[in-house]
């Protein structure tokens, strides 16, 4: 019964995404409103930040009222590549391979220019507490999620184009991201080339990408760099197995999917590198995750101490983790 329900949900979602041509709203897309092109609103960071939060948190969808259209996010395409690849591997239906290849070609067109390798950002501008991020400005989060889908296509579909894009994206991680390095040479990757933020799940996505590029090429620089990035994040795991969101004072919370991202990336690194020294940290983190992010009735919780808001990313990440 549960398997049938999962299959039904999967194909209903897939049909919806294809019908919408992979376009949709994002929690942080509030600044796509034409209102924010007005002189007063285009440069007022605080006002834009709280307006973005209001659109995100509103119980009703304000986007049609504000003139915000559904966007095509490169991250969605990367996740769809991963999904079609997984479906093809499961049922060997050629249609899924072809759809994955089509999206891989489309992702090439969205890659940001002027960097050492392939990289991506979101299709909307957004306000972080520390900066204004323009649409399509590349981040290690967007790039890492997309490259993960491409890696699966490179391995499972033998896609040469996907392989080349993963290896190219690793050059972006190596040469364009900033680093905060400790005395033991462990370090944290920045969120983007334009900041020095220390966000745990973001740095782990960079490390996973390097591990995947190493698996495809055998290039030692990829894996030694990944190891030093992993060491930094593992030093910041507490005794319970927890990572907070970031080193910022405003980033002290613990939530479902950012924790899941760290665990997924760590698991991938261990498998691809053969380095089992971080297995105890993985097991401790997984134990904490299972005991604190899934309620007794099976519903994914958003925070470690709060079930709500009910969130599709938390639900999806719980299945993966």
What function would you assign to each model-found segment?
Residues 1-321:
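Glycan-recognition and catalytic cores of secretory/periplasmic carbohydrate-active enzymes
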């Amino acid at each position: 019964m549960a398997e049938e329900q999962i299959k039904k949900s999967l194909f209903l979602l897939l049909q919806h995404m294809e019908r919408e041509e992979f376009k949709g709203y994002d929690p942080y897309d509030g600044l796509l409103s034409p209102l924010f092109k007005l002189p007063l609103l285009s440069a007022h960071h605080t006002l834009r930040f709280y307006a973005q939060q209001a659109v995100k948190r509103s119980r009703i969808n304000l986007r049609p009222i504000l003139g915000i259209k559904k966007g095509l996010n490169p991250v969605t395409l990367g996740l769809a590549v991963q999904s079609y690849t997984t479906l093809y591997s499961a049922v060997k239906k050629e249609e899924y391979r072809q759809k994955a290849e089509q999206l891989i070609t489309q992702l090439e067109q969205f890659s940001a220019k002027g960097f050492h390798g392939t990289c991506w950002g979101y299709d909307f501008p957004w306000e972080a507490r520390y900066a204004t991020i323009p649409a399509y400005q590349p981040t290690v989060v967007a790039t890492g999620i997309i490259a993960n889908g491409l890696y699966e296509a490179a391995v499972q579909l033998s896609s040469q184009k996907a392989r080349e894009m993963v290896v190219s994206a690793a050059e972006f991680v190596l040469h364009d991201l900033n680093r905060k390095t400790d005395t033991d040479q462990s370090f944290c990757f920045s969120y983007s080339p334009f900041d020095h933020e220390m966000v745990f799940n973001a740095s782990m996505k960079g490390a996973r990408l390097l591990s995947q590029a190493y698996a495809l090429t055998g290039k030692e620089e990829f894996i030694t760099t990944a190891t030093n990035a992993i060491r930094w994040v593992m030093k910041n795991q507490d005794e319970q197995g927890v990572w907070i969101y970031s080193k910022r004072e405003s980033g002290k919370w613990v939530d479902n999917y950012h924790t899941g991202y760290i665990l997924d990336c760590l698991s991938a690194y261990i498998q691809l590198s053969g380095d089992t020294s971080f297995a105890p940290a993985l097991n401790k983190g997984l134990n904490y995750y299972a005991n604190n992010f899934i309620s007794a009735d099976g519903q994914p919780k958003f925070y470690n101490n709060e079930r709500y808001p009910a969130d599709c990313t938390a639900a999806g990440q719980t299945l993966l983790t």
